[in-house]
């Protein structure tokens, strides 16, 4: 796990390729996908993440109609409502979902390093008439496949089985922790999960409804890495020493943005 490195900062604020933070990749994807309203939900050590998010103009999004919102658990003298899982973190911020007007929601983990046009996932979601679309990735290296939710899919892309962190499996396609779902359906599923004292998005929504709802997998064929362990965090940073990886992220459209606070030289461009 990442406790050795993340005991003083959120994983989403961990440095990647020098100047970047892990969350920059997901937020850049959202900016490039023209998403106007973004909520960042964080549990522990939020200060460094908040400083990072507030320091860059690239995260302004659409302030008139949307904007960037950061939510942490509500801690009072009477109670401490720590998030008990991804579904619970969304449920505890239900008011944000209910006050929004957008028909669809993109849920994305802050510890993934990748490029993705979420509009393409949404288009796929609509074409398939899916209830939930999961962005999936085929792993060539299966040594750490037990860290992920492993999925079985039909040729048409429908997910027929989801095995969360299996000890053994012959499958190699995993969930990246990126989902597209209609907002009203998400609210309905979260409220149902809360009524039943269920808190995990994968186990208590995806697995629970895999045979009831139409869940499809959108295949991501480009670079993707998850930095939730020390080994994967090290390997991801080592990947950026490779020219093809650097060129893919920093020389090919769309851009990856970062905050000026992390640039050491004033003459260096803020958009790479």
Predicted regions, residues:
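N-terminal glycine-rich phosphate-binding loop and ensuing alpha1 helix
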Residues: 1-58, 64-66, 77-79, 96
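Catalytic cores of nucleotide-enabled group-transfer and carboxylate-activating enzymes in metabolic
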Residues: 7, 12, 21, 27-33, ...
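Conserved beta-strand scaffold positions in the cores of enzyme catalytic domains, especially
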Residues: 13, 67-70, 215-217
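Residues that form or immediately flank small-molecule/cofactor binding pockets and catalytic motifs
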Residues: 18, 73-75, 137, 164-167, ...
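Residues at the starts of beta-strands that form the adenosine-phosphate
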Residues: 36-37, 131, 214
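Conserved beta-loop-beta/alpha segment of the NTase-like Rossmann-fold superfamily
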Residues: 61-155, 180, 188-192
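Catalytic-core segments of class I nucleotidyltransferases/pyrophosphorylases
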Residues: 98, 102, 106, 113, ...
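Single conserved hydrophobic/aromatic residue that forms the stacking wall/gate
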Residues: 261-272
């Amino acid at each position: 796990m990442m406790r050795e490195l993340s005991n003083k900062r959120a994983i989403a604020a961990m440095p990647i390729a020098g100047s970047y933070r892990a969350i920059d990749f997901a937020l850049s994807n959202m900016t490039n996908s023209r998403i106007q309203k973004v909520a960042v939900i964080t549990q522990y050590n939020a200060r460094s993440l908040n400083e990072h998010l507030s320091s860059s103009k690239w995260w302004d999004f659409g302030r008139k109609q949307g904007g960037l919102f950061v939510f942490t658990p509500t801690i009072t003298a009477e109670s401490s409502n720590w998030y008990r899982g991804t579904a619970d973190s969304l449920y505890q911020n239900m008011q944000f979902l209910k006050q929004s007007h957008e028909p669809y929601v993109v849920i994305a983990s802050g510890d993934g390093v990748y490029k993705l046009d979420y509009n393409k996932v949404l288009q796929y979601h609509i074409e398939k008439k899916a209830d939930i679309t999961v962005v999936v990735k085929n792993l060539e290296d299966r040594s750490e496949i037990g860290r992920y939710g492993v999925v079985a899919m039909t040729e048409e892309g429908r997910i027929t089985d989801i095995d969360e962190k299996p000890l053994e499996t012959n499958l190699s396609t995993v969930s990246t922790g990126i989902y597209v779902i209609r907002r009203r359906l998400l609210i309905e599923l979260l409220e149902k999960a809360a009524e039943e004292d269920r808190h995990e998005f994968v186990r208590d929504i995806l697995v629970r409804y895999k045979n009831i709802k139409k869940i499809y997998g959108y295949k991501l064929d480009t670079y993707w890495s998850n930095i939730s362990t020390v080994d994967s965090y090290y390997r991801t940073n080592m990947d950026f020493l490779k020219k093809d990886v650097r060129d893919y992220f920093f020389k090919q459209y769309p851009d990856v943005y970062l905050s000026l606070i992390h640039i050491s030289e004033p003459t260096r461009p803020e958009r790479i």
